[in-house]
């Protein structure tokens, strides 16, 4: 089967566990996910089956929205609730106004240092493997983009914020840095991913939904179409001649179109056909094709 599932990941399992469960339910090997969530985090994780796995790379340009609970006055070695406490300090002096003003410092492009408990590699080793050995190394700072951050509630010592951010943002690091700026320390108490591009919690499925669909023989019916993952890309409708060229792996020329990194191609029947990318000579080549070439009729 080819398609996408918008899964609401429960607490306590890894993103790989989600993929494994989907593989078992669908009896299908070609399954992947579109964005790792830590075991303690819950919420949206798109899961791709069959041909749709070829679209995972295009999710890197979409934003994610998180609901985060941050507790002030405590730091942990993992920056979240799973780690060992390394620092405590009273936060009685912190006001809602102080938090609001400090959060504004995190708008736009910011510099983050990945947590030691992360999948980032250092000399070929995952940081979390080094951290479990009690080894701390210097990490290379990274640029992250925060499109919006909203303070929803503050009842000392816990605040709730909604964050819209770009690819590669560490909410744990944001919580840690917020605590440092406020002078009292902080850690990420809980995290829910509410949205990831076109996918959101409102129309997500849990594993009970998948099991029910399996019992009813409706597993194919709950799959989202491939184009759900690339709704953020520019799109163009092409005639049969150009579609045929793309299906055959040939470049095409387009007039009056901007040149983003990728464009989704549809045919006259509004069916998703391919993703094309620009060449330096002004032509476009097929990066991914999702329909097969129709067999040629006999010459008789």
Curated annotation (Swiss-Prot):
Catalyzed chemical reaction(s):
uridine(55) in tRNA = pseudouridine(55) in tRNA
Signal peptide location in the record? none
* Stored Gene3D superfamilies: Pseudouridine synthase
Keyword Phosphoprotein appears in the UniProt entry: no
What is this enzyme's EC? Answer: 5.4.99.25
Q: Which family does it belong to?
A: Belongs to the pseudouridine synthase TruB family. Type 1 subfamily.
Name under which the protein is recorded: tRNA pseudouridine synthase B
**Phylogenetic classification of the source organism:** Bacteria, Bacillati, Chloroflexota, Dehalococcoidia, Dehalococcoidales
